[in-house]
Amino acid sequence: MFSNNNRISTRQVFRLFVFDFVGESTLILPSQLAAFAGNDGLASIVLGGIMGSLYLWYLAYVLKKMETDLVTYMERILPAWMKKILLVLLLVYFTGMAGYGAYIFSDVIQKGLIAGESFPLILILVLLTAGYAVCGGIESRARVYEILFVVLFVLLAVMLLIAAGDLEMEYLYGFFQADTGSVMKGSLAVFFCLMPLFLLAFFPSYVQKAKWGKLVHAVHAAMWFAIGVLADRKSV
């Protein structure tokens, strides 16, 4: 049984953020890490995860001070005109991120699944699907991800086990063979893919206040789960 109360559980939060972290990053990070750090990509992944942990700690500290979600806090302390400007900036930011993600997924679909199909048509269908999901709200999205999580990650585990025979062990021992600047570029690329952490600022309104601490722990666990998936992908 599901309840329609505009609330989601911390378990659903964990699964939501895992999909947000893993979805796009597994498509773009392998090539970026290979270009930036070569065999040292694993070090970049770990450093990017540490940067993400520090950023999450800062977000948790700010949310504790605000005692509410970001939008409600802006309504409380800012004049209406300034709040509207910030909301427009947030809209531009999220539109840009969503557009980039839609472009990446459409490109992968065209090249890997239906080669020769019109790219604009694929992109339009991806955007329509995303728009339909947004209209369903966060609670509907959480329900879908809760169902898909086990199925998709069991399949992922099976694929990784099959690929274990192609494991390149030297990737696991390449720490800091590349120069520090290259490793840092790779870690910044990883940190960029962890930017969905910022969404934590909007989640307090969907989780009971008594569970805010568990909310942060769920997001942190999701981030390191995704880091583990990325590290495994880098080693294969």
Model regions and ranges:
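Hydrophobic, membrane-embedded alpha-helices of multi-pass small-molecule transporters
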Residues: 10-28, 44, 48, 52-55, ...
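Perimembrane loop-to-helix junctions flanking transmembrane segments
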Residues: 71-78, 173-182
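Short, Lys/Arg-rich, polar N-terminal cytosolic tail immediately upstream
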Residues: 1-8
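Transmembrane helix-loop junctions in multipass membrane proteins, especially transporters and channels
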Residues: 60-69, 164-172, 210, 235
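Membrane-water interface regions at transmembrane-helix termini and the short interhelical loops
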Residues: 35, 107-110, 128-148, 205-211
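Hydrophobic alpha-helical segments and their helix-loop junctions in multi-pass secondary transporters
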Residues: 95-98, 102, 151-176, 234
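Membrane helical hairpin/interfacial module
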Residues: 22, 26-119
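Small-residue-rich segments of transmembrane alpha-helices in multi-pass membrane proteins
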Residues: 77-89, 148-163, 222-230
